[in-house]
Amino acid sequence: MSYCRQEGKDRIIFVTKEDHETPSSAELVADDPNDPYEEHGLILPNGDINWNCPCLGGMASGPCGEQFKSAFSCFHYSTEDIKGSDCIDQFRAMQECMQKYPDLYPQDEEEEEEAKPVEPVEETADTKASAAKEQGASS
């Protein structure tokens, strides 16, 4: 015997094996694309940018939020052949702002490693032998 039980906000439905064997008669309700409580991705159904998308990692807020929005909007709406090539000034302004707040906008480790001077590598006996062999072969 199947039955339904409400627990707080949840509704628990117990069904029998026979209930599962018959096709469902439930009708699906189409999602409302304009539902303000529905979570959306980066681009809203109307094509606008969803500044509240968690995928932006909070970049749209904070001390450089306006510069980020300006650069990102320019890129999103760019119609140039090389998309965003008309947005260099906006991206430069965003970068300059972010450099003022290194604690909030840390640079990638890869960039930091590239900026470090390269330390000389100690030569091992193997590399000296290889160099001597090459020098002897070229003589």
From Swiss-Prot:
Residues 61-105 form the CHCH domain. A motif (Cx9C motif 1) lies at residues 64-74. PROSITE patterns: CHCH. It comes from the Eukaryota. Keywords: Disulfide bond, Mitochondrion, Oxidoreductase, Protein transport, Redox-active center, Translocation, Transport. GO terms for cellular component: mitochondrial intermembrane space; mitochondrion. GO terms for molecular function: protein-disulfide reductase activity. Coiled coil: none annotated. Residues 104-139 are annotated as: Disordered. Disulfide bonds join C53-C55, C64-C97, C74-C87. Forms intrachain disulfide bridges, but exists in different redox states. Monomer. Can form homooligomers. Interacts with GFER and forms transient disulfide bonds with GFER. Interacts with MICU1. Interacts with COX19 forming transient intermolecular disulfide bridges. Interacts with COA7 through transient intermolecular disulfide bonds. Interacts with AIFM1; the interaction increases in presence of NADH. Interacts with NDUFB10. Central component of a redox-sensitive mitochondrial intermembrane space import machinery which is required for the biogenesis of respiratory chain complexes. Functions as a chaperone and catalyzes the formation of disulfide bonds in substrate proteins, such as COX17, COX19, MICU1 and COA7. Required for the import and folding of small cysteine-containing proteins (small Tim) in the mitochondrial intermembrane space (IMS). Required for the import of COA7 in the IMS. Precursor proteins to be imported into the IMS are translocated in their reduced form into the mitochondria. The CHCH domain contains a conserved twin Cys-X(9)-Cys motif which is required for import and stability of MIA40 in mitochondria. This is Mitochondrial intermembrane space import and assembly protein 40. It comes from Rattus norvegicus (Rat).
